[in-house]
Amino acid sequence: MDTPLLNFRKVHFVTSAPDIRHLPNDGGIEIAFAGRSNAGKSSALNALTQQRQLARTSKTPGRTQLINLFELEPGKRLVDLPGYGYAQVPIEMKLKWQAALSEYLQKRESLKALVLLMDIRHPLKDLDLQMLEWASNSDLNILVLLTKADKLNPGPRKTVVQQVRKATMVFGDSVRVEAFSSLKGTGVDEVTRILSDWYQPEDTPDEISEAE
């Protein structure tokens, strides 16, 4: 039976927090979006939700270095994590951001999946691999979105997708890789299907036995 598709246009902003200790109660299901500062994360979120200003695009690092929570339905949250990889920020600030990302990915009980965005022309940088390792160690479902797919012709695009799929096999079979273009809408329907499935509550042992 196919999972009903969720309406991501209903997503609305809830709160921002500098770290895990300032987030709301750790219940329900969260799916987080993360990526380097130039990976097109804000544009992807806006395309998925069809809300142009949901994730404000900013070239100023300080404006986007908070954990931003949005609610889709009661108990179903979408999380916009701080972008990483800025070149023009002090090392102390970089380390602080990385610590906040690591803590959230490894300690947030309601976190079920990570959507990791990478520019299709420059995938799998060091910090991307670190994020994949943290998410894999936390047994999260992982969706790698290769953004700006419109920048490549179909042949090279398919080649990169296949290369990244092969490279991420080391992180287990919970990793999916898809091409994505906010400009052309490529991948939006597939992301909607995947996330709708991941937002479904898992059956508990009691529920399974009752069904039998």
UniProtKB/Swiss-Prot annotation:
The keyword Oxidoreductase does not apply. GO terms for cellular component: cytosol. Residues 27-201 form the EngB-type G domain. CDD domains: YihA_EngB (cd01876). Mg(2+) binds at S42, T64. GO terms for biological process: division septum assembly. PROSITE patterns: G_ENGB. The keyword Nucleotide-binding applies. GTP binds at residues 35-42, 62-66, 80-83, 147-150, 180-182. Pfam families: MMR_HSR1 (PF01926). GO terms for molecular function: GTP binding; metal ion binding. It comes from the Bacteria. Keywords: Cell cycle, Cell division, GTP-binding, Magnesium, Metal-binding, Nucleotide-binding, Septation. Its cofactor is Mg(2+). Belongs to the TRAFAC class TrmE-Era-EngA-EngB-Septin-like GTPase superfamily. EngB GTPase family. Necessary for normal cell division and for the maintenance of normal septation. This is Probable GTP-binding protein EngB. It comes from Tolumonas auensis (strain DSM 9187 / NBRC 110442 / TA 4).
